[in-house]
């Protein structure tokens, strides 16, 4: 018997609960190219509940989750190759209508409360995609119904697109910003009427925990040590980062140690590959792809091939939680090993 989700039976999860729902993921998007296309099946359960933020406040979310007893925000990262067929089953455990959508690829249409729907579609073009709930836009996306899909070129495990600069490993950085007043309105099936004022900022669903803070170094709650977000590598371990923004706020993604190679912007291959220490990321589903080259940091003296360097956003509010807790926002670390 399936456990019904209702207003009196919410899931309540700390950030650790989110990470445990993704247990088994190493953080890296692992891929081995195939000679032929395949069908990839995945089932998502649309669930709801509360997630405790760094300042202890419980905020309402909805998620594409792996079962009825979980709340996963963002949804699981998926990877396929050009020509594959995706068979996605959506089980809507809620009383409200939702959908599964990837722009220019698929739209499930309305999935009523309590309904299960299976959709099939081909992924024909390599790149980075956000899947999300397109109904009641942008509200269902903002409260957590989103995730990332990577599509690899045929026969390649080291290129973003045919002829792109090559990489050794790859990650998603999926950013979101959270206004708890809006989330509460959506919980009560109301359209938010207040000015958007985000108080929490996440990367892959987690926020930072600075040294000395409870949870620092715990990968289940600390974005700076979350294996999905933190970059680990030796010199030469060039890392593709697929960067998506589910939130409303514009961001500037800033890495220390190395400039990044900026390859795409909003799904379009750039005419030139720029080396940038800050990469602009549009709000409302902005997307970029970039390679962190893991080169010996050029400004280090004496020269150093190991060390820890931050990645943070250059919008100062995004580095806070609850309106002022600094270093509890959307950030992670880069480990030269």
Where does each model-flagged region fall?
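N-terminal, post-signal-peptide metal-ligating segments of extracellular/periplasmic oxidoreductases
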Residues: 3-108, 188-239, 324-337
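Extended terminal and domain-junction accessory segments
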Residues: 13, 36-47, 139-190, 290-337
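Histidine- and aromatic-enriched segments that form or immediately flank copper-ligand environments
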Residues: 42-153, 242-243, 249-285, 308-334
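Short, well-ordered beta-strand elements within core beta-sheets of diverse protein domains
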Residues: 119-121, 228-230, 242, 289-291, ...
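Amphipathic repeat-derived elements
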Residues: 120, 129, 138-159, 166, ...
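A contiguous, surface-exposed recognition patch within enzymatic or periplasmic domains that forms
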Residues: 165-258, 301-312
